[in-house]
């Protein structure tokens, strides 16, 4: 269903958003200075490897770093996959405009307080537009 796919893509784009730092730390905030476009991003890691996949409407790219013999990666090595991914996907867009997905008619955006999960107010320190199926958004 294109409505749910749009919502999922938007959720995954929050991996590189500072709007959620109030209660958690998104996994790709270290990449924010490198990223000039909106990407849906999913990361994963174990003690011995790191994985990042990211995409737009134009491109899907993933990078894996790690060891096949279960040696632990260092913190520096664990950042390598993210940095290689960011540098490469940004190079792809060097002279191009990135396309993002068109919001379906049955999806609505609401300004949400990212700490409480409720509608944002003037007192909300961190806010983000989150997407919902029409009729399921917070009131």
Predicted segments — roles?
Residues 1-138:
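A penicillin-recognizing enzyme superfamily signal
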